[in-house]
UniProtKB/Swiss-Prot annotation:
Function: Catalyzes the cleavage of 5-oxoproline to form L-glutamate coupled to the hydrolysis of ATP to ADP and inorganic phosphate.
GO biological process: carbohydrate metabolic process
Top EC category: hydrolase
Superkingdom assignment: Bacteria
Matches recorded under CDD domains: LamB_YcsF_like (cd10787)
Gene, per the UniProt record: pxpA
Keywords: ATP-binding, Hydrolase, Nucleotide-binding
Presence of the UniProt keyword Hydrolase in the record: yes
Protein name: 5-oxoprolinase subunit A
Amino acid sequence: MAQVDLNCDMGESFGIYQMGTDTQIMPLVSSANIACGFHAGDPSVMRKTLEAAVAQGVALGAHPGLPDLVGFGRRNMQVSAQEAYDMVVYQVGALAGFAKAAGVSLHHVKPHGALYNMAAKDKALADAIARAVRDIDASLVLYGLAGSQLIQAGKNAGLRVASEVFADRTYQADGSLTSRSQPNALLQSDEEAVQQVLTMVTEKRVKAVTGEWVSLDADTICIHGDGAHALSFATKVRAALLQAGVEIKAM
């Protein structure tokens, strides 16, 4: 039976500000990427999200981002490889502390937003992030954009890697995600998301916005927890995968 992980970015509320539909989505996914305070999240949100994931048997992941609360970590910043290493160690270490306090362990690390996209193309940043994950815990799985520098860096560091694809994002001909600054960056209908996911998982390819077919591996599928259609996408994507005989399970 084919198998794929279904992940969601979670714990992105901050103080009195609520983001996402974590409570409803948590039972639908197999792994959760929990914000660690730099782009979103705070200590209480981190703890509560981790506890909710544990209660549902969902694999725990750290979701480190750039220090940009106002921009939600989605704006590029000029950071050195050493700064990227330090940011990842700091944030993963914070969530690992909550995991230890709860008597559980982290399963994976997935960078967030601009840090994720920068590391997909910048070898030095990718290597620094992979090294940070390895130095914290070499058993952690590194999630990265399928076919990206981050996936290769993880392999080079001796880590297990999960090639990630996106249910709600469109793709360019080089396999990169369409920039969020473009009007066609996001898929708007459930039907489009379901069809794209099934094609990526069963055929290992995706159709770019320019019409070309792009080959890719699909170990894990991302649902963005802050997306307008996140709950609907998660519900229908999960149902379609199960109907197609695909088992939903963390790596």
